[in-house]
From Swiss-Prot:
Swiss-Prot/TrEMBL keywords: Amino-acid biosynthesis, Histidine biosynthesis, Hydrolase, Methionine biosynthesis, Multifunctional enzyme, NADP, One-carbon metabolism, Oxidoreductase, Purine biosynthesis
Reactions listed under catalytic activity: (6R)-5,10-methylene-5,6,7,8-tetrahydrofolate + NADP(+) = (6R)-5,10-methenyltetrahydrofolate + NADPH; (6R)-5,10-methenyltetrahydrofolate + H2O = (6R)-10-formyltetrahydrofolate + H(+)
Family to which this protein belongs: Belongs to the tetrahydrofolate dehydrogenase/cyclohydrolase family.
EC number per UniProt: 1.5.1.5, 3.5.4.9
Gene Ontology terms, MF aspect: methenyltetrahydrofolate cyclohydrolase activity; methylenetetrahydrofolate dehydrogenase (NADP+) activity
Protein name per Swiss-Prot or TrEMBL: Bifunctional protein FolD
Pfam families with a match to the protein in the record: THF_DHG_CYH, THF_DHG_CYH_C
Residues given in the record as NADP(+) binding sites: G169, R170, S171, S194, I235
HAMAP family linked to this entry: THF_DHG_CYH
UniProt xrefs under NCBIfam families: PRK10792.1, PRK14186.1
Record-linked CDD domains: NAD_bind_m-THF_DH_Cyclohyd (cd01080)
GO CC terms, sorted: cytosol
Length: 299
């Protein structure tokens, strides 16, 4: 009997496609308005994972033609210093997107800093104004990871209308905006989390299952409905018996691949899509600024 294997939702390939589209768009618009889009990434301290993420973002910016205004601050940087930097970036006409790399040192108020970013420069889509626009179904900058999930599902023409969707995780970064985006696409949405009773019975009903709890291997094959679409948002670094570290998601990929219809890998699934949508948000802000200034005549 032939063993069924789920089709891979290839985020890496789609992210490269999006980057090529953005590159062409930037070349065309820059010739008209005289400057490239700009993204400022603020990092505080020396968290190795954060440093790697920032390098990846800056590399991706360079690839598509976005100017990077990266700022790296020492661990002891004060709240006021960062607030002053954000205030200046809000006024800087060369900067279209601002991102505060999380996590921040404990003495800093991350929420207050995120709220200070001008909503139209909120590259991460986490400002209350942009989240409010999402709730209302209005246009606005969307949270990058869930927006990346939606773009990936659309690329593979996976219909969401009327489907049962379960999101495991309720963070403001992924879980909550993910549920809202699925709802906006006419799915029937359930949010589960670490306090949910009988998680298995909830996930087994999902036509679309999004794992975003940050717990390696949380979702196993017996928790998945046969033929479901399984999206793994988790990025967890684990160490094996030989002391080697590797990235894994929130699902048991090997076993679930024999049950699901579609599945995302880690790495190579949602991670590249998150970066691609960050670039997309920056370019969206860039185009909007150009239109408002009259430098770009777009219908």
């Amino acid at each position: 009997m032939e063993t069924k294997t789920a089709k891979i939702l290839d985020g890496k390939t789609l992210a490269e496609k999006i980057q090529k589209e953005l590159t062409a768009q930037i070349i065309e618009v820059q010739a008209k308005i005289g400057r490239p889009p700009g993204l400022a990434v603020l990092m505080v301290g020396d968290n190795p994972a954060s440093a790697a993420y920032v390098r990846n973002k800056e590399k991706s910016c360079a690839k598509v033609g976005i100017a990077s205004f990266g700022k790296h601050f020492p661990q002891e940087t004060s709240q006021k210093e960062l607030e002053d930097v954000i205030a200046a970036l809000n006024q800087d006409e060369q900067v279209d997107g601002i991102l505060v790399q999380l996590p921040l040192p404990e003495h800093l108020d991350a929420v207050k800093l995120l709220h200070q970013i001008e909503p139209d420069k909120d590259a991460d889509g986490l400002h209350p104004v942009n989240l409010g626009r999402l709730v209302r179904g209005e246009k606005g900058l969307r949270s990058c990871t869930p927006a990346g999930v939606m773009r990936l599902l659309a690329e593979y023409e996976i219909s969401l209308r009327g489907k049962q969707a379960v999101v495991v995780g309720r963070s403001i970064l992924v879980g909550k905006p993910m549920a809202l985006m699925l709802l906006e696409a006419d799915a029937t949405v359930t949010i589960a989390h670490s306090r949910s009773q009988d998680l298995k019975s909830i996930t087994q009903n999902a036509d679309i299952l999004v794992a975003a709890a940050g717990l390696p291997g949380l979702i196993t094959a017996d928790m998945v409905k046969p033929g479901a679409v399984v999206v793994d948002v988790g990025i967890n670094r684990v160490t094996d018996a030989n002391g080697k570290s590797r990235l894994v998601g929130d699902i048991n990929f090997a076993s679930i691949a024999g049950v699901a219809e579609y599945i995302t890998p880690v790495p190579g699934g949602i991670g590249p899509m998150t970066v691609a949508l960050l670039l997309q948000n920056t370019v969206t802000s860039y185009l909007q600024t150009a239109k408002e200034s009259g430098a770009l005549d777009v219908k």
